[in-house]
């Protein structure tokens, strides 16, 4: 569950259950939207948490538009189909990502380490490795 007090939106979901968003207009089922050929990638991130590793990764993408939003909303924008990619190459903790990852995966997206394995939880270390969340 991710709640956005500023907008009154609530997101929930996961895996085999699908994902939804509720706002003043009601409940909407969420679906990711992969980038189409020739479409500029919509990348979510944070200008304040960018580092050299993130900048190097972004440089490999070609043309993209950076959408700066906070915390779990990055995953939610991917789940809504409003963005395509969220590279996080700086530290986060399990509690920063778990709920939002479930919502993204329920909408059809993925969250993987840089080695291509799914981001996992209940590890000995509470810090997450670097990861990329994607809409495809």
Enumerate the language-model features and the residues they cover:
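Oxyanion/phosphate-interacting regions
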Residues: 56-60, 75-136
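Acidic beta-strand-loop-alpha-helix segment within the catalytic core
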Residues: 1-75, 125-136
